[in-house]
Amino acid sequence: MPSTLQVLAKKVLALEHKENDHISREYYYHILKCCGLWWHEAPIILCFNGSKQMMIKTPIFEEGILLNTALMKAVQDNNYELIKLFTEWGANINYGLVSINTEHTRDLCRKLGAKEMLERNEVIQIIFKTLDDTTSSNMILCHELFTNNPLLENVNMGEMRMIIHWKMKNLTDLLLDNNSISEILTKFWYGIAVKYNLKDAIQYFYQRFINFNEWRVTCALSFNNVNDLHKMYITEKVHMNNDEMMNLACSIQDKNFSTIYYCFLLGANINQAMFTSVSNYNVFNIFFCIDLGADAFEEGKALAKQKGYNEIVEILSLDIIYSPNTDFLSKIKPEHISFLLKNFYPKNLYIFDRCKPGLYYP
């Protein structure tokens, strides 16, 4: 194992990627290659994220990937020099057990201190920790490292369900319904990419999984990504009617103002949207539907009573004080929706707050 001084020197070199008047770029790159600080035909850049976690950057991983994730990729590629380098820098060698595909690499990991095999719950923990990094690079890597990984074939689906629900919320049942583990995981990474509008990752999955277009639309509706939804709609990749789209926009999470408004512009039934929001206890969505002209208050109250949602019954009982928001009388262009609704607060929720202070805390 190299000395601490050698390890430190390599870290310093990896951190110092600046133009230097006293040394040519070619010679500097030659030094980096000789020190093993080279990946994907380019220098390895070492940096730290906001949580002070070490990150590795290359032209392929421009946003940076966590050190342990970089180790898993190096193991998958059977890149022995980088396996040793990342371990020297503090990567957990046991992460490498996720992506081993040759006995020679397994032997190297053993020599570097890896255990013989991972427990099922350890594989789940590794996935969970890897998901801390929400970037296009990381979602693509998650797909490459985990989706068709034999270690995931016998994973505890109860534990896997918790991870999926952490990111997918009420889409979890739809995702887990009658799908193979590889399809579940592919849709999972794809769904995260859409949820956080990771454009490079969205394009990566779109090019490879054209049969998952409906899933992409479902995620865009559910997670308020109106820009991606509009992109799919204008290219005729949406095969749902307007009310089906509105149902997803209102049911999965609260404050889905952009996708609700988009479906409203397409002609979806705004009263039905309010009923869906009531059924799912999405209070912001209820008030936004009222802003857009929903007025079926008696039916909404009956549904809320049936569900036992007393607070919503109280909200809908004050229908006399509500009125449509005139700001929406002039239609907003789809490309402007996200910007205009970014910090939006429903007018009728503001009225309700003034009338019944303290009853509901949004």
Swiss-Prot record:
Could you tell me which residues the ANK repeats occupy? 66-98
Q: Which Cys residues form disulphide pairs?
A: none
Q: Does the keyword Lyase apply?
A: no
Top-rank taxon of the source lineage equals Viruses
Keywords for the protein's UniProt record, in alphabetical order: ANK repeat
InterPro entries referenced in this protein's UniProt entry, alphabetically: ASFV_MGF360 (IPR002595)
Choose any GO biological process term that the UniProt entry carries and state it.
taxis
Q: Name one Pfam family in it.
A: ASFV_360
- Of which family is this protein a member? Belongs to the asfivirus MGF 360 family.
Role: Plays a role in virus cell tropism, and may be required for efficient virus replication in macrophages.
Q: What is this protein called?
A: Protein MGF 360-19R
Name its species: African swine fever virus (isolate Warthog/Namibia/Wart80/1980) (ASFV)
